[in-house]
Amino acid sequence: MTSHPVFIDLSLDEQVQELRKYFKKLGAEISSEKSNKGVEDDLHKIIGVCDVCFKDGEPSQIDGILNSIVSIMITIPLDRGENIVLAYCEKMTKAPNQPLGKVCLQSLWRLFNNLDTASPLRYHVYYHLVQVAKQCEQVLEVFTGVDQLKTQFANCPPSSEQMQKLYRLLHDVTKDTNMELSSKVMIELLGTYTADNACVAREDAMKCIVTALADPNTFLLDPLLALKPVRFLEGDLIHDLLSIFVSDKLPSYVQFYEDHKEFVNSQGLNHEQNMKKMRLLTFMQLAESNPEMTFDTLTKELQITEDEVEPFVIQVLKTKLVRARLDQANRKVHISSTMHRTFGAPQWEQLRDLLQAWKENLSSVRDGLTNVSSAQLELARTQKLIH
C-alpha cells in the first residue's frame, strides 16, 4: 500500500480551529473554540468526536479531514502522544462500511509511515491497521509476509508479548484467504516462546498444527516437531496426528481417523482433504526408496483404483514435489527425484555425499580441461617451430 507524506498548509492553531468548527457543524458535542490547555487537549476532543463524519460525509472529504488530524498528531512528542494515537486508532476501527473502511485504512497507513521508525507507537498503529484491513478485505495490502513485518519494526522491535498478540491477529485475518501465509505466521508465533514459557502456549501450538495440516500447500511438517510448544503436546491426540503426517503412511491415518473421528472433525479438519494430503505424502515417501513403482503398488498403498492412478500422479507432478514419468504401457511410474518428507541426519549425509561427488566430478573435468589446454599449447608451439 502506498502512502503519501502528510502536509497541511495551515498552522496547527488554524487546523485545530477549522476541525472544531467542522465537527461542531456536523452536530458533534464539541466547542468551536480552542482549548486553553493546548493542542493535545484539542486533539483529544477532536478525536473523541471524529467518527461523526462517518455518518454523511463523502469518502474523499473524510480522507481530507482525517489527514488533517494525522498531520497534527505527528507533531506531538512521543512521551505525550500514546493516548492520543491509541484513541485515534480505536476510532478508525469503527468505520460503518467498506468504502469508509478503506479511507480509515489509508489514514492509519499514513500515520504509520509518518511516525518515526524508532517510535514504539508504530506497533499499536499497525495492530489496528491490520484489524481495519480485515474489515475491508485489504489484508495483503498491509501484510505480505513475516520478513516484511520484521523489516518494518527493525528500528524498534516490539516485545515478545506484543509480537505474539500481533501474530495471533495475523493468523486470524489470513486463515480463511491464505492458509499458507497463515501457517507461516503460526510457526513464527510458536518460535517466540522459550523453554520457560512454552508450556503456556498449548492453544497456539494446537492452532499451528491444525493450520499446517489443513494447508494444501504445506507438506514439510517435520520442523513443527522441533518447536518447544509443540513438544509439550507429546502424548496428546493432536501431536499423534501431526506425527502421522510427518512420517507415517496413509493406513496409519485411516486407522487414526477410525479411532478418533470425532476429534479430527472437532478440530475443523476435513477428512477428504486429509486423505488427499496423506496420499501425496505417502507417494513421496515411497518415491524416496523406489526409483520405479507399479500401478498395482500404488493402488494398494494409496487405496485408489487403477483408473485413478494416472490422474493422481499428474496432480502430484503439478506440485513439483516429485519429478517422475508415467509409463502407461508397462503400468509403471519412473521416479527422477522427490522432496523428502523429513530432513534429518540421514538426509544431511546423503546431501553431503552428493555434493562431494559433484566436487570430485568437477575436479576431474577441470583436470581434463587443463590437460587438453596444455596439449593444445604444446602443439601450437611445435607447429610454430616447424614453420
Swiss-Prot record:
Keywords: Cytoplasm, Golgi apparatus, Initiation factor, Protein biosynthesis. Residues 181-340 form the PCI domain. The keyword tRNA-binding does not apply. One of its GO terms (biological process) is protein secretion. It is found in: Cytoplasm; Golgi apparatus. Its main location: cytoplasm. One of its GO terms (molecular function) is translation initiation factor activity. GO terms for cellular component: eukaryotic 43S preinitiation complex; eukaryotic 48S preinitiation complex; eukaryotic translation initiation factor 3 complex, eIF3m; Golgi apparatus. Transmembrane segments: none annotated. Coiled coil: none annotated. Component of the eukaryotic translation initiation factor 3 (eIF-3) complex, which is involved in protein synthesis of a specialized repertoire of mRNAs and, together with other initiation factors, stimulates binding of mRNA and methionyl-tRNAi to the 40S ribosome. The eIF-3 complex specifically targets and initiates translation of a subset of mRNAs involved in cell proliferation. Belongs to the eIF-3 subunit M family. Component of the eukaryotic translation initiation factor 3 (eIF-3) complex. The eIF-3 complex interacts with pix. This is Eukaryotic translation initiation factor 3 subunit M. It comes from Drosophila pseudoobscura pseudoobscura.
